[in-house]
Design a protein with these regions (language model features):
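Secondary-structure end/capping motifs
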Residues: 82-186
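Short, small-residue-biased leader/transition segments that mark boundaries at the very start
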Residues: 1-3
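A bilobed periplasmic-binding-protein/Venus flytrap-type ligand-binding module shared by bacterial periplasmic
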Residues: 68-85, 99
Length: 251
């Protein structure tokens, strides 16, 4: 959000007021004028356009095509205590991703997600492909990449880029020991085992470099230089972040 603001000569600290509100509340706040806009994915942006309360300025694919979305996270002590369950859970998510990637299942998934327990909105507002907000044509191109070569594989380079952005806006000091931290939190080995057991052939797949709309190349080998070359950033610090030893799971 802050990076996209900067690309349009908007200083996110000076020119706008950013606040966090629940996704389900965003449309109501936009309708009554409590906010001027919001940054969110489907179905809330599509619904605003369909109901005439707003319009998308830019989509996420225009900002960072192929960007990471949701993650499956687990506490380290639990993962150590139950390694087989951790792998089985990862396999289940991979199989679910493969199911969601098939357009033949999109109508079923829209019906499921429309339930009050989940999104609580009309199924036709829940899309899985790239379409015009004013037309109901069947999408030929998926918007969300649920499954495919390297799509689900954890990427430490992407984790590292996110760390640089948190430091860029002074949310955290940039960790001097970022390699150690990424090795602890990005469980590539668990994914590799799960993928291998499912017969997937993308265990060793390597993603291409991170390419954002601003055209500034991200050098994962020198994140500090990357931060320093950004035209606007807050004063950031670099510090050793103690990570400690994995704690034992309480019995």
């Amino acid at each position: 959000m802050c990076s996209s603001d900067l690309s349009n000569a908007i200083d996110p600290d000076r020119d706008v007021h950013l606040q966090t509100i629940p996704p389900a509340q965003m449309l109501a706040d936009l309708k009554d004028g409590s906010i001027d806009g919001y940054c969110i994915g489907d179905p809330w942006n599509f619904r605003a356009a369909r109901e005439g309360h707003g319009f998308p300025i830019a989509g996420d694919l225009e900002i960072w095509s192929g960007h990471p979305g949701k993650v499956l996270g687990a506490r380290e002590d639990w993962a150590i205590a139950y390694p087989n369950t951790h792998i089985a859970l990862t396999k289940a998510v991979l199989e679910a991703c493969r199911y969601c990637a098939d357009p033949a299942h999109w109508d079923e998934l829209s019906q499921l997600l429309s339930d009050r327990r989940y999104l609580g909105m009309k199924p036709e507002l829940i899309r899985f492909g790239v379409t015009d907000a004013n037309h109901d044509t069947s999408p030929a191109e998926p918007h969300t990449l649920f499954f495919g070569p390297g799509v689900n594989r954890p990427s430490r380079s992407e984790h590292l880029w996110i760390l640089t952005q948190l430091a860029r806006w002074s949310e955290i000091p940039f960790p001097r020991n970022y390699v150690e931290i990424l090795e602890r939190i990005c469980a590539v080995g668990v994914y590799s085992t799960a993928a291998r057991e499912l017969g997937l052939d993308d265990v060793t797949y390597q993603r291409s470099g991170i390419e954002l709309f601003d055209g500034v190349p991200f050098n994962a080998d020198d994140p500090i230089s990357y931060l320093n070359q950004l035209s606007i950033h807050k004063d950031f610090s670099v510090a050793e972040i103690p990570v400690g030893v994995p704690r034992a799971l309480a019995s």
